Design a protein with these regions (language model features):
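Long, low-complexity acidic/proline-rich regions
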Residues: 108-109, 120
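Short conserved micro-motifs at the rims of enzyme active sites and ligand-binding pockets
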Residues: 100-103, 122-124
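A short, sequence-level motif marking secondary-structure junctions
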Residues: 104-107, 127-129
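Compact, glycine/acidic-enriched structural inserts
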Residues: 117-142
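A surface-exposed partner-binding patch
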Residues: 1-100, 141-143
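Short, flexible beta-strand-to-coil junctions
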Residues: 91-95, 104-105, 115-117
Length: 143
């Protein structure tokens, strides 16, 4: 479903081989958070998605672990920013901001995080909407 949806919206998208169940379980183990259902579902079909310019719209399972743990452990980040422990960063824009899942009272939501201000703003509530905005509206859609 995800591969077809992505290629329908953005034929130039670069899709990877799927992530396996062992890999997804390792992501949850390392991050100590469950993967949102729709993100896990996408990763089961393609382990990451890039646009034609190489921007990682959705990170691979490996990058999910590496980047999230690095952000949580970076001493400077611990002083400068509110904690990231309840967030799962999963994508970025060539303009600097990164996107993360957070849990809201209504379920998971996707926020954009601005590293300059530590502002975290809910931008969409579904991965489908996030992908549509990234691929159809371009890199500045979240502004």
């Amino acid at each position: 479903m995800w591969r077809e949806l992505i290629l329908q919206m953005y034929p130039e998208a670069d899709l990877n081989d799927p992530a396996d169940e062992v890999t997804l379980a390792e992501v949850e183990k390392h991050l100590m958070l469950p993967l949102p259902f729709e993100l896990a579902s996408l990763l089961r079909e393609t382990d990451g998605v890039s646009n034609e310019y190489g921007d990682a719209v959705v990170w691979s399972a490996r990058r999910l672990v590496e980047d999230n743990l690095a952000m949580r452990r970076e001493p400077d980040y611990l002083e400068l920013y509110a904690p990231f422990d309840e967030m799962i960063f999963f994508g970025d824009s060539d303009m600097g901001p990164q996107f993360a899942y957070v849990h809201t009272d209504y379920g998971p939501g996707i926020v954009v995080w601005d590293h300059e201000s530590d502002r975290r703003r809910l931008v969409v509530v579904s991965l489908r909407d996030y992908l549509a905005r990234c691929f159809i509206q371009g890199n500045a859609w979240f502004r």
